[in-house]
Swiss-Prot record:
Modified residues (Phosphotyrosine): 24
Physiological role: Type I interferon cytokine that plays a key role in the innate immune response to infection, developing tumors and other inflammatory stimuli. Signals via binding to high-affinity (IFNAR2) and low-affinity (IFNAR1) heterodimeric receptor, activating the canonical Jak-STAT signaling pathway resulting in transcriptional activation or repression of interferon-regulated genes that encode the effectors of the interferon response, such as antiviral proteins, regulators of cell proliferation and differentiation, and immunoregulatory proteins.
Primary gene name: IFNB1
Entry protein name: Interferon beta
Top-level taxon in the UniProt lineage: Eukaryota
Any Gene Ontology biological process: B cell activation involved in immune response
Gene3D superfamilies the UniProt entry points to: 1.20.1250.10
Species this protein is from: Equus caballus (Horse)
Disulphide-bridged cysteine pairs: 52-161
Length: 186
């Protein structure tokens, strides 16, 4: 009697697992589109690093991010999420001294948050399936990197020049994010 339910249950489990699995190609496409929007918004902010030559800074991007070569798609998703989260936090800080258009900054924050929302759903599934120790060291290095950016802004009292330097760094970050999205493939 119980045998006749085993096959339908097995098929149901198989199909539901397939239906629930992460569609990395769709995610990659969505993230690339949103990254392009963020890039456009960041470029609309009026900052020119040439005007602040004394305020240059090397924030020391983690090497595995700058020269990403061996990422598993699950690790890439986790790293992308972490980068977006810190980017979002940075742009929520005091940027009043910049003269930036608040609407542009708000739109940038919306785009970044939208990417985070898209990733959160997938990350929940990824985290259930595996635990990555590789990602932990990279995440720690990323936190230190973004900490240096935050400390720089604070030390410079959120000056226009400091924000201009950070804006240029965030433009670099978007290039790194685009490179990382290449690892999100089915």
């Amino acid at each position: 009697m119980t045998y006749r339910w085993i096959l339908p249950m097995a098929l149901l489990l198989c199909f539901s697992t397939t239906a629930l699995s992460v569609n990395y190609d769709l995610l990659r496409s969505q993230l690339r589109s949103s990254n392009s929007a963020c890039l456009m918004l960041l470029r609309q902010l009026n900052g020119a690093p040439q005007r602040c030559p004394e305020d240059t800074m090397n924030f020391q991007v983690p090497e595995e991010i700058e020269q990403a070569q061996q990422f598993q798609k699950e690790d890439a998703a986790l790293v992308i999420y972490e980068m977006l989260q810190h980017t979002w936090r940075i742009f929520r800080r005091n940027f009043a001294s910049t003269g930036w258009n608040e609407t542009i900054v708000k739109n940038l924050l919306v785009e970044v948050h939208l990417q985070m929302d898209r990733l959160e759903t997938n990350l929940e599934e990824i985290m259930e399936e595996e635990s990555s120790t590789w990602g932990n060291t990279t995440i720690l290095r990323l936190k230190k990197y973004y900490g240096r950016i935050s400390q720089y802004l604070k030390a410079k009292k959120y000056s226009h020049c400091a924000w201009t330097v950070v804006q240029a760094e965030m433009l670099r970050n978007l290039a790194f994010l685009n490179g990382l999205t290449d690892y999100l493939q089915n």
